[in-house]
Amino acid sequence: MAKEATRVRRRERKNIVSGVAHVNASFNNTMITITDAQGNTISWSSAGAMGFKGSRKSTPYAAQVAAEDAGRKAAEHGMRTLEVEVSGPGSGRESALRALQAAGFTVTSIRDVTPIPHNGCRPRKRRRV
């Protein structure tokens, strides 16, 4: 019995004008996900996905390259305006935001959605270097 040929699904070009850019800047990596208003992912990128390894993932330059890549993919779908939600304490927050603006997106609002505990879990021990 012949094996059925696997069909390659082409990524259909959605025409979405505005969306939300979620920038998650942790201490070790920076992830950028661009979604539509409902939260469906349009494009994503991260410093690790752009080929940075180890401690280079946490640099502002790696966040800038990842944001440019995610922005380029989103622009292919016709996206022009973005709301930006920044989360996390990492060093790539501002550089990712600047890269999205430099990529030609109109940033309508910037929100910091970093979760702050009202004295929740016990924090990890202090580093002694």
Swiss-Prot record:
This is Small ribosomal subunit protein uS11. GO terms for cellular component: ribonucleoprotein complex; ribosome. The gene is rpsK. InterPro entries: Ribosomal_uS11, Ribosomal_uS11_bac-type, Ribosomal_uS11_CS, Ribosomal_uS11_sf. Part of the 30S ribosomal subunit. Interacts with proteins S7 and S18. Binds to IF-3. PANTHER family: 40S RIBOSOMAL PROTEIN S14/30S RIBOSOMAL PROTEIN S11 (PTHR11759). Pfam families: Ribosomal_S11. It comes from the Bacteria. Belongs to the universal ribosomal protein uS11 family. GO terms for molecular function: rRNA binding; structural constituent of ribosome. One of its GO terms (biological process) is translation.
